[in-house]
């Protein structure tokens, strides 16, 4: 009995020592180190008018974003951005075609080149003209309003600010190239293939009456000279004549005209060096619209830039005021009229990566 108790004491002593050892080891175990980790975050969305587009967060791997820009959009390496989050374009080129609904162009075998561009670059598939007929849309694209004009009047001049005046004030160069226009600053109203209502710049008083500005509205023949000499201005507007813009001639004629012109633009330093080319139509053939102001039909619109998205189709709603807003915002210009409306969305998604 005593021997048994003695053995039991040794067992109890052993268990006690084992317990103390375990507690000591647990007490000495260091806490794991805290390692900072970067967790992927969901970018916030910004709603503007009828368009909800993601605002991408800036990345250290991309071009540095100005510190004052708190709503930046990621763009391709090599491209700087403005306070709006848009690329700071070196050159902006716009070509305006005529009088076709988007459905008349998309998939049309008579427009193979435009459809090829849509596959290779970016298309705004829900983009609308503002009104009917042509002239109000040209004014909307350049002045941010139709200014109460509802016809293709030839002498209904406008005393209003406009993109050309803004560019000149900001020290940027600009030129409007008008096919079949007989000479710079031509104030006549109509020729066989030229119509002034497709030339919005001649409607603005501060351009038409100022030789320094008016002489920047030139015949299209000057474009090839400037392109080959690498002297294109910062802002380029191109209006084809009334046949090549599809107004009076077949879609295939306008498509062929673009097939000759656009590759020359895309091969130029002006486009390759931070450039962007927009191709749109002044109006469609329906009353469809979006974004509070537009009711001029859905029109085929392309965004072509070496820093833009490729093979991209946007279903967000845009209109001519959106395009003007995008141009002005990319160069930190004041927003004209309805281009500054809260219901006018910015076309920044085409350059986000």
Residue ranges and their predicted role:
Residues 23-40, 44-56, 60-353:
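N-terminal pro-sequences and low-complexity stem/linker regions of secreted or lumenal proteins
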Residues 19-21:
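C-terminal motif of bacterial Sec signal peptides marking the signal peptidase cleavage site
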């Amino acid at each position: 009995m005593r021997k048994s108790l003695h053995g039991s004491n040794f067992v109890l002593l052993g268990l006690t020592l084992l317990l103390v050892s375990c507690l000591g080891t647990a007490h000495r175990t260091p806490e794991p180190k805290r390692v900072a980790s970067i967790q992927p975050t969901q970018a916030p969305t910004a709603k503007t008018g009828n368009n909800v587009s993601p605002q991408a967060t800036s990345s250290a791997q991309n071009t540095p974003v100005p510190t004052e820009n708190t709503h930046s959009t990621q763009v391709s390496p090599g491209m700087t951005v403005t306070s709006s989050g848009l690329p700071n374009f070196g050159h902006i080129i716009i070509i305006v075609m005529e009088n076709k609904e988007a459905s008349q162009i998309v998939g049309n075998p008579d427009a193979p080149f435009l459809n090829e561009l849509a596959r290779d670059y970016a298309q705004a598939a829900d983009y609308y003209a503002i009104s009917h007929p042509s002239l109000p849309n040209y004014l909307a694209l350049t002045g941010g309003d139709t200014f109460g004009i509802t016809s293709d009047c030839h002498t209904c001049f406008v005393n209003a600010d406009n993109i050309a005046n803004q560019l000149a004030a900001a020290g940027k160069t600009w030129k409007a190239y008008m096919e079949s226009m007989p000479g710079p600053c031509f104030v006549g109203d109509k020729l066989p293939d030229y119509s002034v209502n497709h030339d919005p710049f001649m409607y603005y008083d501060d351009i038409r009456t100022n030789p320094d500005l008016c002489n920047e509205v030139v015949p299209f023949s000057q474009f090839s000279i400037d392109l080959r000499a690498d002297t294109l201005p910062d802002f380029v507007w191109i209006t084809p004549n009334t046949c090549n813009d599809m107004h009076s001639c077949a879609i295939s004629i306008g498509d062929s005209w673009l097939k000759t012109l656009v590759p020359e633009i895309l091969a130029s330093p002006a486009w390759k060096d931070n450039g962007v080319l927009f191709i749109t139509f002044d109006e469609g053939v329906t009353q469809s619209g979006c974004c509070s102001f537009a009711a001029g039909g859905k029109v085929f619109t392309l965004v072509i830039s070496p820093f833009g998205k490729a093979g991209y189709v946007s279903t967000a709603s845009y209109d001519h005021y959106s395009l003007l807003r995008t141009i002005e915002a990319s160069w930190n210009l004041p927003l004209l009229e309805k281009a500054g409306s809260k219901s006018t969305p910015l076309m920044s998604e085409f350059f986000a990566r």
